[in-house]
Amino acid sequence: MKPSERRKARRLAVQAIYSWQLSGNNIADVEHEFLTEQKIDGIDVTYFRELLSGTATKQAQIDELITPHIERPYDEVSPIEKAVLRLATYELTFRKDVPYKVAINEAIELAKAFGAEDGHKFVNGILDKIVGRK
């Protein structure tokens, strides 16, 4: 099965969020860099842009939703897991058209693809708590 355009947009967005977190560059510059330097065929570019800019502009709000569910200092969370959590929390909170099960499953897949060995379990646990399933 081919990945959907939105799945590809999420994958690119989490990489861009990761880059933004580490570089501290302006989010518009990061967006431009990713859209000009990455292969974007088959990607929902509009959704990519929304995920990236929305996550960046709502970062403080998103982090306030995440941090109560983490049992260690937030700055000790790996940057890739933080990027996945921020992206998924943005979708869960601000994209009501995306079913929470889809947002969580996509986040788990992103954590498996980019995160540490058991990073997907950590991401799943936090997101379940955010949506109130635990």
From Swiss-Prot:
Q: Which family does it belong to?
A: Belongs to the NusB family.
Organism of provenance: Shewanella woodyi (strain ATCC 51908 / MS32)
**What is the protein's known function?**
Involved in transcription antitermination. Required for transcription of ribosomal RNA (rRNA) genes. Binds specifically to the boxA antiterminator sequence of the ribosomal RNA (rrn) operons.
Q: Name one GO biological process term.
A: transcription antitermination
Q: Which UniProt keywords apply?
A: RNA-binding, Transcription, Transcription antitermination, Transcription regulation
Record keyword Lipoprotein present: no
This chain belongs to the protein called Transcription antitermination protein NusB
Question: What are the transmembrane regions?
Answer: none
Question: Which gene is annotated as encoding this protein in its UniProt record?
Answer: nusB
